[in-house]
Amino acid sequence: MTVESVNPETRAPAAPGAPELREPPVAGGGVPLLGHGWRLARDPLAFMSQLRDHGDVVRIKLGPKTVYAVTNPELTGALALNPDYHIAGPLWESLEGLLGKEGVATANGPLHRRQRRTIQPAFRLDAIPAYGPIMEEEAHALTERWQPGKTVDATSESFRVAVRVAARCLLRGQYMDERAERLCVALATVFRGMYRRMVVPLGPLYRLPLPANRRFNDALADLHLLVDEIIAERRASGQKPDDLLTALLEAKDDNGDPIGEQEIHDQVVAILTPGSETIASTIMWLLQALADHPEHADRIRDEVEAVTGGRPVAFEDVRKLRHTGNVIVEAMRLRPAVWVLTRRAVAESELGGYRIPAGADIIYSPYAIQRDPKSYDDNLEFDPDRWLPERAANVPKYAMKPFSAGKRKCPSDHFSMAQLTLITAALATKYRFEQVAGSNDAVRVGITLRPHDLLVRPVAR
């Protein structure tokens, strides 16, 4: 199967007598009104993982809407690379209240291409070393703030460091702890509410003055107020540092006019919130991995000491820390922050021999794809060595794409891996970790995956 085989514009006409495209099978277990939404809400990870038993493409019902679920990694790669599938669908509709319609995360077509041109220079591989000193400082500040033997709330600490790195590197802002805490609290509420709105799309109910709806609306309003404060402070300062916020404030549209205020706002939201949320979630799962797999924490410590000779780990060491990187990738495989993605078919097309009608919403789960036993031996085992070159070559191409692929690939992939590597190396070098009584590392499903309430104790090495 090739990418071209799912592109209706490049697909060769069917030969006379060729079989007609099939309709995908329908998953069982739907109920009136809610369809499969109740199963997706009750146990979403199990539901999405079980769909692979029904075929490569499966029809499900979310409320009254038919949605096409894709379970085959090669077909998810085709979705990512094919321009006939746009960013749209239940996930993105649920995120519009946060991300807006004019940011790079939700835009399509010419607008998306122009926005990528604006932000991409900040994330080029040759631009990342300029952020190195900030990443180093934040990684080591994190280890200094924690005290041996004292319980650490992994949720708040992970989110705080993720927001600080993003703000200091990309916005050059001094909006640190107080705003990071506001962002952390508000995002937890907003992402939970948006997930409910995605899987059970009962719009009128979410407008009722119920306590959960009020909490959601208050948190969303505070997020947007926070972004407006950041933009206003930069303008009032008269400063123009070489950062992403300056690039946005000076960006032009296709007519050569300054971009609108709403687009600037939506772009800053896209910089601060989804990126910080996904990085923070990954740090939480890395802390769990360091606590639950001390042998790999020890290997990271040994690797760092071999590379640095005992000095503090630095940005210049990142590319040499191979096992550290493999631990990060394996943590992302088993617990991807972004566990579900959606697309919309612009035109009628063929996917894996099935007909996808124009306008159809398509959903797939990186969580399910990355745990598929057809792609991975010992698929549920935490095994960073599966990413050694000789073993990684056996993993299907699109069975592990934590930053997506094609034109919708996350632009900050190198930036994200650099900060995750520095933070993991700094933590594992200074401490061993153990979960404490009361810690709950069960998966909490929202727009992203987090532990419910991960509490760890650092133990000095």
Swiss-Prot record:
Its cofactor is Mg(2+); Ca(2+); Mn(2+); heme. Heme binds at residue 410. It holds the Pfam family p450. The keyword Flavoprotein does not apply. One of its GO terms (biological process) is ketone biosynthetic process. It comes from the Bacteria. Its EC number is 1.14.15.39, 4.2.3.47. Divalent metal cations. Mg(2+), Ca(2+) or Mn(2+) ions for farnesene synthase activity. It catalyses: (+)-epi-isozizaene + 4 reduced [2Fe-2S]-[ferredoxin] + 2 O2 + 4 H(+) = albaflavenone + 4 oxidized [2Fe-2S]-[ferredoxin] + 3 H2O; (2E,6E)-farnesyl diphosphate = (E)-beta-farnesene + diphosphate; (+)-epi-isozizaene + 2 reduced [2Fe-2S]-[ferredoxin] + O2 + 2 H(+) = (5R)-albaflavenol + 2 oxidized [2Fe-2S]-[ferredoxin] + H2O; (+)-epi-isozizaene + 2 reduced [2Fe-2S]-[ferredoxin] + O2 + 2 H(+) = (5S)-albaflavenol + 2 oxidized [2Fe-2S]-[ferredoxin] + H2O. Optimum pH is between 7 and 8.2 for monooxygenase activity and between 5.5 and 6.5 for farnesene synthase activity. Keywords: Heme, Iron, Lyase, Magnesium, Metal-binding, Monooxygenase, Multifunctional enzyme, NADP, Oxidoreductase. GO terms for cellular component: cytosol. Disruption phenotype: Disruption abolishes biosynthesis of both albaflavenone and the albaflavenols, but not epi-isozizaene. Residues 1-28 are annotated as: Disordered. One of its GO terms (molecular function) is oxidoreductase activity, acting on paired donors, with incorporation or reduction of molecular oxygen. Belongs to the cytochrome P450 family. Homodimer. Involved in the biosynthesis of the sesquiterpenoid antibiotic albaflavenone. Catalyzes the two-step allylic oxidation of epi-isozizaene to albaflavenone. First carries out a non-stereo-specific oxidation of epi-isozizaene to give a mixture of the albaflavenol epimers ((5R)-albaflavenol and (5S)-albaflavenol), each of which can serve as substrate for the second oxidation to yield albaflavenone. This is quite different from most other P450s which catalyze regio- and stereospecific oxidation. In addition, displays a farnesene synthase activity with farnesyl diphosphate (FPP) as substrate. Both enzymatic and structural data demonstrate that CYP170A1 is a rare bifunctional enzyme having two distinct active sites within a traditional P450 polypeptide chain that individually catalyze two apparently unrelated biochemical reactions. This is Bifunctional albaflavenone monooxygenase/terpene synthase. It comes from Streptomyces coelicolor (strain ATCC BAA-471 / A3(2) / M145).
